[in-house]
Amino acid sequence: MITRLFENDKQLEGFFSSLDKKKKYLLALSGGSDSLFLMYLLKSRAIFFTAVHVDYGWRETSYQEASDLAALCEQEQIPFILDRPEATDPMDSRDIENAARRYRYELFYRLCKEKCFSGVFLGHHADDQAETILKRVFEGAHLGNLKGMSAQVMYRDVALLRPLLHIPKHKIVEALDSHQVQYVQDITNCNERFLRARMRERLFPYLQDVFGKNIRDPLLSLAGDSAELREYLDQQTAPFLLRVVDNERGKLLPIEQELLKTPFLAKWVCKQFFLNERLVASKSFLQTVYDHLMTGSTARLRLRNRTVLVKARGVIIESIY
């Protein structure tokens, strides 16, 4: 057994010192290098957890891999849960990657509720984080939404815990190899039918080759800047959202001319106003709202199934009757 891993890592120590070690947790255990590393890391930090493995049956070897994981957990005295959903061929679905993810997270949520687990540990690492950030850049995400995955975030009311986000993949592999720990090489992670695999196998190597430098660390730095920007924007936005009132038509967000002098903040305030009503506004929609506010013209716009009324000095989300 690996008794200590990264014991001088201050970020890890800070993460684990904030956890309640009297509680029990789930570990999403795929059998790959990342989740196995995390399994031994949790043991070394005296975290009480149960491993859960989802065998989709996509590979001929997956049944044996699940059995091997069960045996390993028994050897390490780790409680183990095996889930086998109805088999689906990954080549038969256009959205199998996201569908599988949704299935896992719903399973984790159900187990946490049924068995009183306090959260789920996930093995996402620095390379995964960089992929997430680059994907969001290409998708045109707002500058305040480029922070990537969070070390702790809530899925509904269950905590998702990602302590490895600052650790590069190669360090995880090196640590396991140095202790002669075997792990699964999931070929679906290299299947370029999936976007993540194409980014991992083709895009990142190409960009690093052309750029001539490591691109992971600059992307992680961008995520850090985005997180700080998001915190600042939220602080600046809060006073404006406190002014939201209910009137005879619906929710009213008063907009003063002073705010319109800062377009970036004005559009962010409107964005958060809509989000608070579970409405996701595109950049073009926010720009349209801002343009009408600037000119003082009245407009009735549709946002999903709601009507948004833009008037001089205010935005109203009309009530549904």
Swiss-Prot record:
The Swiss-Prot or TrEMBL note on domains reads: The N-terminal region contains the highly conserved SGGXDS motif, predicted to be a P-loop motif involved in ATP binding.
Q: Which protein family is named in the record? A: Belongs to the tRNA(Ile)-lysidine synthase family.
User: InterPro entries of this UniProt entry?
Assistant: Rossmann-like_a/b/a_fold, TilS/TtcA_N, tRNA_Ile_lys_synt, tRNA_Ile_lys_synt_N
GO cellular component labels: cytoplasm
GO molecular-function terms, A-Z: ATP binding; tRNA(Ile)-lysidine synthase activity
Pfam families with a match to the protein in the record: ATP_bind_3
Q: Does the record carry Nucleotide-binding as a key word? A: yes
Q: What is the lineage of its organism?
A: Bacteria, Pseudomonadati, Chlamydiota, Chlamydiia, Chlamydiales
Q: What is its EC number?
A: 6.3.4.19
Which superkingdom is the protein from?
Bacteria
Query: Where does the record place it?
Result: Cytoplasm
Q: Which residues bind ATP?
A: S30, G31, G32, S33, D34, S35
Quote the protein name from its UniProt record: tRNA(Ile)-lysidine synthase
- Judged by the first EC level, this protein's enzyme class is ligase
Q: Which GO terms describe its biological process?
A: tRNA modification
